[in-house]
Amino acid sequence: MDVISHFAARYERTREEEMSLEDYLAECKRNPLAYATAAERMLKAIGEPTTIDTRNDPRLSRIFANKVIKVYPAFAEFYGMEDSIEQVVSYFRHAAQGLEEKKQVLYLLGPVGGGKSSIAERLKQLMQEVPFYAIKGSPVNESPLGLFDIAEDGAILEKEYGIPRRYLTRILSPWAVKRLEEYGGDVRRFRVVKRYPSILKQIAVCKTEPGDENNQDISSLVGKVDIRKLETFAQDDPDAYSYAGGLCLANQGLLEFVEMFKAPIKVLHPLLTATQEGNFKGTEGFGAIPFDGIILAHSNESEWKSFRNNKNNEAFLDRVYIVKVPYCLRVTEEIKIYEKLIRNSSLGAATCAPGTLKMMSQFAILTRLKEPENSSLFSKMLVYDGENLKDTDPRAKSIQEYRDYAGVDEGMSGISTRFAYKILSKVFNFDSTEVAANPVHLMYVLEQQIEREQFAKEVEQKYVGFVKELLAPRYAEFIGKEIQTAYLESYSEYGQNIFDRYVTYADYWIQDHEYRDTDTGEVFDRQALNAELEKIEKPAGIANPKDFRNEIVNFVLRARASNQGKNPVWTSYEKLRTVIEKKMFSNTEELLPVISFNAKASADEAKKHEDFVTRMVAKGYTQKQVRLLCEWYLRVRKSS
């Protein structure tokens, strides 16, 4: 299907369908969604979650304590926000059941750039997916069920059409009351339309923002009289009223109130009755206007605190369902957020050197975590990401211990994902000759930006400390391994020679025999053999050489039996491979000709250098980055 046909089909699918009141009631009998509340339709749009048994994944089992967690496909790209999303869904679930949440404002509370607006936007998109039914021509999208009285008609509607009585508490709008009078009480003259909520047309989805303290009034929520119509209608006539307020437009849908607590308190008053009683008063002297929708608000913590501390606002506080939306605290998930942002920009095709996003993520999360007791902050970050530190940091605690000590406000401060993304944008564009990112430029840009942001002195020192004391040394170790593996592949023959020599020396040393080198005629006694073996073992810090040598010789003897009497390849035994790699990599003089970008002394060296660069490029670096990172690594190594 081409794009034009696809658009036409979508437009046709969401067109209004008109029907009689009798047909609508028959539809109610067939399909409970015909009379569903906004919360029920939202649940339908969100859909069923997929469950993940975290016992089957070592990393997730540590993070979620072996629990079965729910993941909602509708929020698949909201990484690291499982708790917040589950609370939002719980709100809709309880509201759909007709519980107290139905009468409350869903309030997303969190730091700047933490994802509140993204959740709100996603909920508005989901609201558009399931249609609702309204009286045709109603300026407030009111439900046809408002025409019926629960006391008089409830039993009949429940028996004949299966409509539970709790759906019959809606009232008629003043506009519908006037039409009913005009029709002489004949409800059959009302027509019903099936409509899809629409953000663009402001049908059952609306956004309200705080205005100026002096000129914003309740009309932004409840509407006001239309002066142009006063020539035809009296001021208190429902037809002279402009139902353009947020509560009017969002009936049977969702009203988003951005930065709600920045609005003057007088503006918020209609929300009290709209949520609790399902209706609100307009600015003119006619009856109440129905409201059966969801009010979604969000703001930063500072506004919430000042609002909460004002005793005059107690009536509101009891009508708010708070969902905290903290920053992501898991490195792996934070990386996914950056990848998503980069993917949706022109940087998606640019080279991002391995370790860049991880370093940015680690820095961001270090700023968000609360300092633990008797443990390092870096270890806490690794534990939060599901790593097992049992063997590497005996002082590391369990994830629950860290959380208990940190309290409920962890993740509500630190640098935002928005800040991190701006840093990454600068890093990608740091080099004027190529659009690419690498960790060395990232560290430089981070330090510059920390100074420019004018944080408090102690915060600035702490953040710079994260870069210099935690991230830089670990990156030096990481890039060292990257260079090492690319370098060693140029020396597979050299590695095999060391392996064969080590095995021979160890075998003679164990048997306490002298060894004569067949090429040079040199003789090694047990002491000389030990000295040669230690040259290989010492860079790797082998604690018990005797056991290690026995272990290696036994392995090689077994391997020879199935390899026609030949030694296995030097990379086949992980323990000895590591020892040989460290031995080969311990001598910078041997390393320099291959990884440095100076003029080469021989064609052989030049070939090895080219092979090294090619392998680094295959790992995900540009040629320019290979040079920069190698030079940075050699400088760091020299200074240490």
Regions from the language model: what does each represent?
Residues 1-40:
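Long, basic/Gly/Ser/Thr-rich N-terminal segments
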Residues 32-640:
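Conserved ASCE/P-loop NTPase catalytic core
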